[in-house]
């Protein structure tokens, strides 16, 4: 709790990696941060990006522990929305990492929006690495750079921030540069 209230919230903009052991409470820390930023009017529009297997868990935990209601993005909701851009219609949204990284249409729709805070869970999946002198940027890494440009506050959460190679860690940390 002190990490959220004493260390992170006073810094503006908030752009950092939250790296801790599995089951160490990263989701709770993110929830506290989201709730507090919402109460302070620093974050009205919040997007959470996570692996598909975790989206409903995020939705449930944010509702049950923090009283925050988030919608889940889906192809069906996008197809049925009146504005033709579900991302623009929702102020609190959870989307699947691979659904966004593999779909250029969704990225084009996202490009038309701005977010106060974007949280990425399992952010180590947005990796890039050096192969000789060349940088190999994955689609997920490109998504991470793209998301960083859509928001003022950017939180990357991971239990495994790097693979032991300093160059790859520097590439991962560059996602925060926005």
Where are these regions (language model features)?
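Short acidic donor-binding/metal-coordinating loop in glycosyltransferase active sites
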Residues: 18-20, 122-123
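P-loop (Walker A) phosphate-binding loop of NTP-binding proteins
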Residues: 21, 51, 160
């Amino acid at each position: 709790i002190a990490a959220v209230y004493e260390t992170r919230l006073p810094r503006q903009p908030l752009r950092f990696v939250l790296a801790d052991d599995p089951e160490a409470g990263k989701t709770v820390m993110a929830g506290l941060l989201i709730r507090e930023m919402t109460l302070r009017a620093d974050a009205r529009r919040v997007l959470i990006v996570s692996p598909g297997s975790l989206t409903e868990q995020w939705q449930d935990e944010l509702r049950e522990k923090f009283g925050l209601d988030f919608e889940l993005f889906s192809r069906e909701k996008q197809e049925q929305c009146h504005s033709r851009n579900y991302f623009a219609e929702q102020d609190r949204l959870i989307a699947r990492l691979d659904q966004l990284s593999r779909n250029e249409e969704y990225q084009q729709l996202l490009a038309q929006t701005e977010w106060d805070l974007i949280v990425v869970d399992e952010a180590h999946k947005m990796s890039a690495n050096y192969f000789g002198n060349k940088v190999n940027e994955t689609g997920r890494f490109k998504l991470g750079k793209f998301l960083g440009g859509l928001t003022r506050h950017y939180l990357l959460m991971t239990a495994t921030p790097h693979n032991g190679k300093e160059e790859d860690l520097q590439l991962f940390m560059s996602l925060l540069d926005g």
